Amino acid sequence: MERRIFGIETEYGVTCTFRGQRRLSPDEVARYLFRRVVSWGRSSNVFLRNGSRLYLDVGSHPEYATAECDDLSELVVHDKAGERILEGLLVDAEQRLAEEGVTGDIYLFKNNTDSAGNSYGCHENYLVGRHGEFSRLADVLIPFLVSRQIVVGAGKVLQTPRGAIYCISQRAEHIWEGVSSATTRSRPIINTRDEPHADAERYRRLHVIVGDSNMNETTTLLKVAVTDLVLRMIEAGVPIRDMTLENPIRAIREISHDMTGRRKVRLANGKEMSALEIQSEYHSRAAEFVDREGFGPVHRQMLELWGRVLKAVDTGDLSLIDREIDWATKYQLIERYRAKRDLPMSSPRIAQMDLAYHDISRTRGLYYLLERNNQVDRVAHEPRVFEAKNVPPQTTRARLRGEFIRRAQEKRRDFTVDWVHLKLNDQAQRTVLCKDPFKAVDERVDKLIASM
């Protein structure tokens, strides 16, 4: 597949601290957050002018799904734009609460677990051809995805019966199946529910739900770029060593608990390999593939970073990657603080730091403190992020959806949209079906807009 459509869906954690008598439940806090959305969209499930979807998911979790992107850097920009949109809702909600006499702070966390042990996800979407054998895709991808956490995990302080330990992945403890059609009940690595949001005869949507939510833009870019490379190798028929895991679910937890990347996990053929060895195998195949096929600068930069992360894990020298990779950045931050204050990993202050790293408020969040102090690298520069809050990607179907929404709102027309339909709710109930996610220009949509 020459071009590929990508998308990221992120569920956010919500909590609120109060200083007065009145208390609000998480459901009520979520309703305050979405009050402005509901006032213009008449729903807590809306599509925005930038082509994205914003909605309140199960369990009062705000969720933002980026518009369809065919460019990796643009995907990162749109993921960050979603963060900024939610930050704006947070500021509005706090002002509204203050006007009503409720004193408190609302927090939105771009992480994957709350203090009660609940998990919420960051789902990656990759458009793949229908003609390929999906089961083979999953077979090759699962060992890659299980071990990928040592490269792009978000890091977590995990309380265990033997004390607190620092883990590489937040999501690893909450994955229960390899491949499944459910997302909440069983939490698989790859979700197989067949919803391509495109021409079902031509495409499938690979829905990866094993990944962590990343604060660092470079980690997000790396996560999607290396997965895209592995997909392209599979699609091109590149021979990849059989590293099928005997028990992917046990392996994902064992790998997460070992920052050295050296702990061996058992393969289905009885052999054993470490996460470092598994990732190195994929990386060396990818390096040959990129050299042979010729890729653009983004894939080449991410291939270099992938190798550098593996070197950092191998040598234990996290200074090689602590500006770019979330789990390393957070670990170094926590370790410096612990050394200064002589604190154990189990200290409540460390748990608080772990959470504060993921606070999306730019005035309060620990990650944004590092960003202000130029201690982390960026790939999505702020003017582009600001523009992406309102402007859809211009080379995919998202452009049609965004333009339709913008014009309908300006003309005060009642409309309904989803990923594939654009509908004017007038007497004629005119609807355009947009099955091709690569198509950014469509005469039928132009006519529908002109008729408003």
Curated annotation (Swiss-Prot):
UniProt-annotated binding residues for Mg(2+): 9, 55, 63
Catalytic activity: ATP + [prokaryotic ubiquitin-like protein]-L-glutamate + [protein]-L-lysine = ADP + phosphate + N(6)-([prokaryotic ubiquitin-like protein]-gamma-L-glutamyl)-[protein]-L-lysine
Enzyme Commission numbers on file: 6.3.1.19
Highest taxon, organism lineage: Bacteria
Any single biological process term in GO: modification-dependent protein catabolic process
Record keywords: ATP-binding, Ligase, Magnesium, Metal-binding, Nucleotide-binding, Ubl conjugation pathway
Active site feature: 57
HAMAP family, per database record: Pup_ligase
Function per UniProt: Catalyzes the covalent attachment of the prokaryotic ubiquitin-like protein modifier Pup to the proteasomal substrate proteins, thereby targeting them for proteasomal degradation. This tagging system is termed pupylation. The ligation reaction involves the side-chain carboxylate of the C-terminal glutamate of Pup and the side-chain amino group of a substrate lysine.
PANTHER family: PUP DEAMIDASE/DEPUPYLASE, PUP--PROTEIN LIGASE
Listed name of the protein: Pup--protein ligase
Species annotation: Geodermatophilus obscurus (strain ATCC 25078 / DSM 43160 / JCM 3152 / CCUG 61914 / KCC A-0152 / KCTC 9177 / NBRC 13315 / NRRL B-3577 / G-20)
